[in-house]
Amino acid sequence: GNSLGGEFQVTTYTTEDQAYPSVAALADGGFAVSWSSTYQDGSDYGIFGQRYDSSGDAAGGEFQINTHTSQGQYVSTMSGLADGGFVVIWNSDGQDSSSYGIFGQRYDANGNPTGSEFRANTYTSGIQFNESYVTENVAGLADGGFVVIWHDENGRDSSGSRWSGRGRCGCLGILIE
């Protein structure tokens, strides 16, 4: 395809590093971007985002996605949802009372958080993370829900959880062997 404009800067906060971006297409033709930002939330890394309308213009300002700010939250991935909203998933250090866990936040079509930050992994012993920093994925489903998949280093397996359109976990977890 042809470019619809020039290169643009997503982040407005430019102190330290802003890295590991992810982008999701939204139902209204816009898109949302998330990334990891060093020290912006007072911790090692935090997860931040920005929405854009169908013309590619920023819709509102840059916003913080993670509410838990102890230690670090790293490497987000996101997906657009059937209702026009989106969900962001990331790795969080120490938040699940063990080591790294998989956490997320859902947003409505206007970019407002729906519910609170949630833990996607049900098994919390050890690490649901991988040093490759590409460990979790999320996909929106036609019914408005989503599926989260990650690598569990404890058993070297891939695991996942499915969530309803209301943001409720519909299962105890998925083990992919």
Language-model regions: role of each:
Residues 1-177:
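Extracellular, repeat-based ectodomains that mediate carbohydrate processing or recognition
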